[in-house]
């Protein structure tokens, strides 16, 4: 089962079209009990990196910051597929902090992509 946490305001503004998927639930609130049991906090922007309208201000309201990460378990990590909008979707202290594994994630992605490219050569 996968739980996806997002914000009701974003959903109501139809920024996303959520598909109907089996075993997936959408939760519109951040529950401290769930944060405390999370293994990973991952964020990404679902709009163009070039958008300069009101979506930028909307992002800041839901930024992953140190206060949110402090509510997670000691072993929880922060992930992002990069590039990140630092100061809008994630704070500088989180993305560069001890719980962040974004650079390891990027390195693993490069290795996987090289493997796919090598496989496609055959």
Question: Model-derived features: where do they sit?
Answer:
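A short, acidic, amphipathic alpha-helical segment used as a generic capping/interface helix at domain edges
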Residues: 30-34, 60-72
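Adenosine-phosphate binding glycine-rich loop
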Residues: 75-76, 82-122
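Glycine-rich phosphate/diphosphate-binding loop of Rossmann-like nucleotide-binding domains
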Residues: 1-43
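Short, well-ordered secondary-structure micro-motifs
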Residues: 14-17, 53, 114
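Hydrophobic/aromatic residues located in beta-strands of well-ordered beta-sheets
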Residues: 2, 78-79
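Glycine/threonine-rich flexible loop motifs
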Residues: 45-63
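Donor-nucleotide binding loops and adjacent catalytic segments primarily
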Residues: 4, 11, 66, 106-107
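Glycine-rich, N-terminal phosphate-binding loop of Rossmann-like dinucleotide-binding domains
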Residues: 44-45, 82
């Amino acid at each position: 089962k996968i739980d996806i946490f997002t914000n009701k305001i974003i959903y109501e503004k139809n920024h996303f079209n959520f598909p109907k998927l089996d075993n997936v639930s959408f939760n519109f609130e951040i529950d401290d009990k769930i944060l405390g049991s999370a293994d990973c906090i991952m964020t990404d922007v679902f709009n163009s990196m070039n958008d300069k309208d009101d979506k930028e201000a909307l992002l800041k309201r839901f930024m992953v910051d140190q206060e949110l990460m402090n509510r997670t378990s000691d072993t929880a990590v922060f992930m992002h597929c990069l590039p990140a909008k630092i100061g809008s979707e994630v704070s500088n202290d989180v993305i560069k902090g001890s719980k962040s594994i974004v650079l390891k994630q990027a390195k693993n992605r490069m290795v996987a992509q090289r493997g796919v490219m090598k496989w496609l050569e055959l």
